[in-house]
């Protein structure tokens, strides 16, 4: 009776309901007109008008006591309002939860279950509402639609347990196994809306299909990262067979290729990558995965070409398309994770991968040019702040400079290498300590990086090698000596347990320090040899063996010098000790040194140590 008083009469009630429904339908049609417009101020204004119209309509409906006859429309308006808000925000956030909660509370108001509203949170409200929904079959289509939006919110916020329980209730399932979530989504059958139902921006079944694809992809990616490859393959196949827009399909195909590559099936992986790169747009993730696949297959030319295409793809500015005014798979995917195999990073990170792989594969001219391009990107500020490529761990910016100098020296461009070294030196020399410091103490300084001394030492080392290439022995020896002077100012101290920084490449700083000392001593020793000063060379080679025990390169250079000086007895004794060492694993062989240092050590390594040992065996004994 009170309801009739508020509405005037049953006739006026029906008239208001018709007006409200017509208003909802008009707003939905208006949104679909806006959807067909390109990105423009007119589209933006039209969509905003629809959003405000839905907000006002919802305010009118919820300003009256809840009634079963009006609730299907009210719940539909809530669904349209949430759908439009989420699509405009390009994602689901917790601030949508109050709209869902208010809709559930309105259902319970019709059953006079106020205590359920007060005592339960959102999960409890759903239990209560779905329990009474059997008494209100006319509400089921709208409730399932609202449940789909709740599922989207919980999927986006990783509340998978709540999502599982909700779907079990919707399906009438008794199982509580969380791993059945994919099956629960597949078996969920939202009721079909009647032909005279209020219009919706997106129906419940379409939303269910989006949820199924998004969850399958999220689960497959998670399983891929954790190493559950067969399960990942199954989940990703499910995602690929679902409602998958082209950008998402590219990611799914790339993830499938990654999974198959890790399972040792490169040819099948390649088929998915071919599908991923079809079409007009160039996508970064499949190109990065292609480079990994070709590297695994030993096809260096194809690997480098893939990285070149990746750099090109990341340099293109993509014009964003107008977002759909409905819930799409992209809205339910997690934000880009640097640890993900699908993360291809920035243009500078891709350029670094290309440059470093050229350096590692002896494509020295290409490496030099790519490093110079990379330095230009980093120095002109056109790129976001450079950070190491996530997989494998990449270098800090100073190490990029050092690798660039190494590449230039290897390409015979010593003068350019000196210029790069001078640029890096101007940026780091002010951070050097003014007095000798313990390595561990240097780490605790607030201004100086713990890697600063090795970086500057490496600059002097590379400058020395550049002068060697230019035939300036005096300058070369001077730079090697400056390198050693700085290195011996820093005293290694036992490193406490803890994770290595990205600059250390899984190698302790003390090992880098040790190898730098050996490299500088060997390099200066080789210059003494070139100048006919074998006695000075002997001192440096002997010291290099002492500072880096187990370094076979230093030992071979020392042995050759002893033989040239005709110190036969010492040479025989040392050769016997060295021959015994060759049967043992070389010390520090399991550590991965920074690329610039690995490359440098290759330069000063005797070309054929086994042949040298055999020569010593026949000549000394």
Where are these regions (language model features)?
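Non-TPR docking regions that flank or precede TPR/alpha-solenoid scaffolds in eukaryotic proteins
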Residues: 1-621
């Amino acid at each position: 009776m009170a309801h009739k008083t508020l509405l005037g009469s049953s006739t006026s009630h029906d008239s208001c309901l018709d007006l409200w429904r017509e208003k909802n339908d008009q707003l939905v049609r208006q949104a679909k007109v806006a959807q067909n417009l390109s990105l423009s101020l007119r589209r933006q204004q039209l969509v905003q008008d629809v959003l405000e119209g839905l907000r006002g309509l919802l305010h009118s409906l919820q300003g009256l006591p809840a009634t079963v006859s009006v609730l299907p429309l009210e719940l539909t308006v809530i669904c349209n309002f949430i759908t439009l808000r989420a699509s405009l925000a390009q994602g689901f956030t917790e601030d949508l939860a109050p709209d869902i909660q208010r809709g559930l509370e309105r259902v319970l108001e019709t059953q006079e279950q106020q205590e359920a509203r007060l005592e339960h949170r959102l999960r409890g409200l759903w239990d209560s509402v779905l329990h009474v929904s059997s008494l209100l079959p006319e509400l089921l289509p709208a409730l399932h639609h609202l449940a789909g939006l709740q599922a989207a919110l919980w999927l986006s916020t990783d509340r998978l347990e709540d999502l599982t329980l909700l779907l079990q209730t919707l399906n009438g399932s008794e199982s509580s196994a969380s791993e059945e979530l994919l099956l629960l989504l597949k078996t969920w059958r939202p009721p079909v809306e009647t032909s005279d139902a209020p219009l919706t921006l997106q129906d419940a079944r379409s939303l269910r299909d989006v949820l199924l694809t998004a969850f399958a992809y999220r689960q497959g990616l998670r399983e891929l990262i954790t190493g559950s490859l067969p399960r990942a393959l199954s989940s990703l196949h499910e995602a690929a067979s679902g409602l998958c827009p082209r950008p998402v399909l590219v990611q799914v195909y790339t993830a499938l290729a990654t999974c198959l590559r890790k399972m040792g099936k490169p040819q099948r992986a390649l088929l998915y990558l071919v599908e991923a790169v079809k079409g007009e747009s160039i996508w970064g993730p499949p190109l990065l995965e292609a480079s990994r696949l070709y590297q695994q297959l030993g096809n260096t030319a194809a690997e480098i070409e893939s990285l070149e295409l990746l750099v090109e793809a990341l340099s293109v500015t993509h014009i964003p398309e107008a977002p759909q005014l409905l819930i799409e798979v992209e809205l339910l995917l997690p934000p880009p994770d640097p640890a993900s195999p699908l993360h291809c990073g920035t243009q500078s990170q891709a350029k670094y991968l290309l440059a470093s792989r050229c350096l590692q594969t002896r494509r020295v001219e290409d490496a030099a040019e790519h490093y110079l391009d990379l330095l230009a990107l980093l120095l002109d500020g056109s790129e976001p702040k450079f950070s190491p490529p996530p997989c494998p761990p990449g270098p800090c910016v100073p190490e990029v400079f050092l690798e660039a100098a190494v590449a230039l020296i290897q390409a015979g461009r010593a003068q350019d290498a000196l210029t790069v070294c001078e640029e890096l030196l101007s940026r780091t020399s002010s951070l050097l300590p003014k007095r000798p410091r313990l390595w561990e103490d240097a780490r605790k300084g607030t201004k100086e990086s713990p890697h600063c001394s090795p970086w500057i030492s490496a600059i002097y080392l590379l400058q020395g090698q550049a002068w060697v290439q230019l035939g300036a022995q005096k300058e070369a020896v001077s730079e090697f000596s400056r390198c050693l002077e700085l290195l011996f100012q820093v005293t290694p101290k036992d490193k406490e347990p803890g994770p290595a920084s990205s600059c250390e490449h899984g190698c302790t700083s003390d090992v880098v320090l040790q190898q730098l000392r050996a490299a500088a001593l060997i390099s200066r020793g080789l210059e003494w040899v070139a100048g006919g000063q074998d006695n000075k060379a002997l001192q440096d080679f002997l010291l290099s063996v002492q500072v880096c025990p187990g370094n076979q390169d230093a030992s071979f250079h020392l042995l050759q010098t002893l033989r040239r000086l005709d110190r036969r007895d010492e040479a025989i004794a040392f050769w016997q000790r060295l021959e015994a060492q060759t049967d043992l694993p070389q010390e520090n062989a399991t550590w991965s040194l920074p690329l610039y240092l690995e490359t440098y050590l290759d330069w000063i390594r005797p070309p054929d140590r086994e042949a040298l040992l055999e020569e010593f065996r026949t000549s000394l004994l």
